[in-house]
């Protein structure tokens, strides 16, 4: 398939997912009692919101692991931790909020890491390793969850439990085969200037752990906001959350808005719609809007500081030149 065809197919898939999500949201939210949503918001225990916020902070802190692992994998180990933390937070938050995350995350990373003698090829390699970490974590989580609780997938894929369990075994088997392949010796992929050495067995296990922890922390943060329900456990929320975010990424919708909400409303019919909407509203505030505002402020402050520094240097150069002018 040629590049133009792939691009058109990608756009078509994105439009289809967003369109389906919009139709689903319209259908599920039609007739919803806004008063009950407000009442559910007011009734949400404050301690649950605080625990959810703490899990969100832990999840964003875990993002540093993505960039640190990628930087170590490409031999860039001299970047200060504060720079890595700043870059991972701002690139992920701004990139995934604007949509087209691969491009926007890369632009933010290049803007920061270019000051540390990194070129576009280095940024592409970082994107590859962070993407691998993310997908390995997702496959591991979904595979294990499908084996342990295959019924958690049923509301979304409408498949019988045994079929979902088979998919889970296939996912775990794929990871095991990948690990065995890596354990067979040094693995290098690519050609010419685009050649990278894949992490070894231990490194890949760490990579999977980073990705899994990311998914678990994020799903727990929304699970804490849901009212207690004996029919819904952590595993079910984890499954719905991972599938929802994957659909959001494929859709390229800014912040996956609408897509994630539609997936939750479909995947968790055990909850009253008003209670679920209230939980999603709170989750969006603490996991999306607040981090986005903070990331924009931090990035803008950095750019303003750099601009001020350049202006000061230009003024100093002008003064020096003037002092030597007869």
Name each region found by the language model.
Residues 39-43, 72, 108-115, 125, ...:
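Short amphipathic alpha-helical coupling elements at transmembrane boundaries
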């Amino acid at each position: 398939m040629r590049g133009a065809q792939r691009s058109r197919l990608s756009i078509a898939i994105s439009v289809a997912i967003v369109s389906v999500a919009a139709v689903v949201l319209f259908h599920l939210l039609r007739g919803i009692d806004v008063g009950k949503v407000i009442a559910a918001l007011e009734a949400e225990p404050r301690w649950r919101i605080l625990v959810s916020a703490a899990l969100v902070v832990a999840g964003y802190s875990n993002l540093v692991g993505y960039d640190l692992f990628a930087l170590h994998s490409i031999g860039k180990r001299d970047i200060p931790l504060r720079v890595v933390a700043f870059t991972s937070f701002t690139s992920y938050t701004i990139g995934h909020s604007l949509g087209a995350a691969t491009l926007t995350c890369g632009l933010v990373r290049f803007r920061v890491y270019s000051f540390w003698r990194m070129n576009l090829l280095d940024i592409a390699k970082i994107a590859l390793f962070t993407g691998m970490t993310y997908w390995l974590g997702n496959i591991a989580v979904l595979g294990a969850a499908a084996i342990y609780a295959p019924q958690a997938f049923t509301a979304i894929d409408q498949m019988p439990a045994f079929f979902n369990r088979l998919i889970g075994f296939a996912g775990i088997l794929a990871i095991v085969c990948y690990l065995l392949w890596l354990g067979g010796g040094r693995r290098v992929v690519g050609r010419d200037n685009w050649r990278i050495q894949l992490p070894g067995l231990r490194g890949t296990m760490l990579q999977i752990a980073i990705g899994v922890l990311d998914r678990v922390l994020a799903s727990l943060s929304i699970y804490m906001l849901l009212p207690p329900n004996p029919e819904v456990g952590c595993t079910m929320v984890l499954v719905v959350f991972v599938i929802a975010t994957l659909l959001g990424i494929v859709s390229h919708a800014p912040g996956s808005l609408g897509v994630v909400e539609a997936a939750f409303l479909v995947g968790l019919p055990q909850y009253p719609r008003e209670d679920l909407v209230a939980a999603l509203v709170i989750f969006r505030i603490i996991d999306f809007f607040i981090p986005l505002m903070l990331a924009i402020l931090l990035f803008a402050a950095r750019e303003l500081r750099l601009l001020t520094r350049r202006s000061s240097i230009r003024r100093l150069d002008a003064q020096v030149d003037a002092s030597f002018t007869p």
